[in-house]
Design a protein with these regions (language model features):
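All-alpha RGS (Regulator of G-protein Signaling) helical domain and cognate RGS-like helical scaffolds
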Residues: 33-184
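C-terminal motif of bacterial Sec signal peptides marking the signal peptidase cleavage site
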Residues: 28-31
Length: 184
């Protein structure tokens, strides 16, 4: 019997060590976690671009009631349709990163590439079209500048992809808006 007990202890000892090593490995991996893919530039980009996009939504919301230009109405709708989900994505990243989600900035300041809307809501027709296009061109240029700055410093792949998309899409929209800008 004594030999049988020793034999059983010899067999359980390696199994116990293996179990202990497995538990230690799991704990070690959990403690290490996956490396952060974002940095402060990614957080700053998302925090700045959210209110910037919100201002574009505000501006786009004015278009249907201020102009009858179907091309401008279509452009404003496309801008809003593209930027609404981007706002949601950026706010999601900020929550995931435990970073403050900035309060909506309807102060219309020049910060973060924002533009001064002035009396835009009081205009209509061709006067509105000209002012809206001029402001949205300026607004888009601010977004492109923010995105390019981010590309030089950001590390998160998803955030960098969004910044690249902002540059390519908004540069195309700037060209479109310049072609729509009434002369004179």
């Amino acid at each position: 019997m004594a030999g049988g007990q020793r034999r059983s202890a010899r067999h359980t000892y390696p199994a116990a060590v293996l179990r202990l090593l497995a538990v230690a490995s799991v704990l070690l991996l959990a403690a290490c976690g996956s490396p952060a893919t974002h940095n402060s530039a990614d957080v700053t980009f998302a925090q700045g671009m959210v209110p910037h996009h919100e201002q574009a939504l505000e501006m786009s919301g004015l278009v249907p009631s201020r102009t009858e230009n179907p091309r401008l109405i279509d452009l404003a709708k496309r801008i809003a349709d593209a930027q609404k989900p981007e706002i949601d994505r950026m706010n999601g990243w900020l929550r995931t990163w435990n970073a403050p989600v900035q309060a909506s900035s309807h102060g219309h300041t020049e910060s973060h590439g924002m533009v001064e809307l002035g009396n835009l809501a009081d205009l209509d027709g061709t006067e509105f079209d000209r002012q809206w296009l001029s402001l949205m061109i300026q607004h888009h240029r601010g977004a492109v500048d923010m995105a390019r700055k981010h590309l030089s410093a950001g590390t998160d792949p998803e955030t960098r992809k969004l910044a690249q998309d902002v540059v390519s899409h908004q540069e195309k929209e700037i060209a479109e808006m310049e072609s729509l800008l009434p002369q004179g």
